[in-house]
Amino acid sequence: MANTQLQLSPTNTNSRQKFTVSFWLKRGKINSEQCVWTTRLDSGNNTLFKFNANDTFTFKCNKSNADALVLTSNALFRDASGWYNVVIAVDTTQSTDTNRVKIYINGVQETSFGTATYPSQNLSLEINESGNQVWYIGSESSQNYFDGSMSYFAFVSETQEAPTVFGSTDSTTGEWQIKTSITPSVAFGTNGFLILKDGSSLTDQSSNSNNFSL
């Protein structure tokens, strides 16, 4: 996907306080800034997940040109041969700030961050809104393209889900493995989607018909 991005403009506004994003990826290049996905109104209002040039990751939300959320890992992600499953589970209504955003890598929650700015309680993030807001998968709006492969990119638009919705631990090897049948605890939500389920198909497999374009 080194020069490719997928794009969708939501037609509905759902909860901007509760959502879960899950995807599987294999990095094709390290030591470079690469955006995996962003939901973007403009440069000062967006939410994104990216790998940094030092191979940490950052999940952040920018509102009115100010950082409302920034989580940058201490851990480095330099394995270009294996797959990572990333699950980002958000519920800003939670009273405890560290429960408002939970990030799991291969089923294990990341708790060590070099930068940790959690969103204020009940904050509406820059996501899940109709109008001029656009989803970009594989880039930061035509820049900082992701170099690698992706599979099973899922968005659950109204609930904070556990990583076990998207993967499970192999009882023999102990490795985190993909669940090919994804069943959210409630539903995908109106803006929810599941793409790249079978090869490179951009057709939404969640029954919502939220299909992406290339």
Name each model feature, range by range:
Residues 23, 81-92, 103:
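Short tryptophan-centered beta-strand motifs in secreted/extracellular beta-sheet-rich domains
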Residues 26-32, 42-43, 63-65, 91-95, ...:
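Acidic glycine-/aspartate-rich tracts in secreted/extracellular proteins
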Residues 1-4, 95-97, 111-118, 149-214:
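Extended recognition patches within non-cytosolic domains
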Residues 3-60, 94-97, 161-164:
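Extracellular glycan-recognition modules
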Residues 7-9, 38-40, 48-52, 58-62, ...:
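Beta-strand-rich, repetitive solenoid scaffolds
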Residues 1-18, 68-78, 140-142, 178-186:
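Short surface loop/edge beta-strand patches of beta-sandwich-type extracellular domains
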Residues 125-150:
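Extracellular glycan-interaction patches encoded by glycine-rich segments
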Residues 21-29, 86-88, 137, 150-154, ...:
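Short hydrophobic/aromatic patches on beta-strands that form ligand-binding or substrate-lining surfaces
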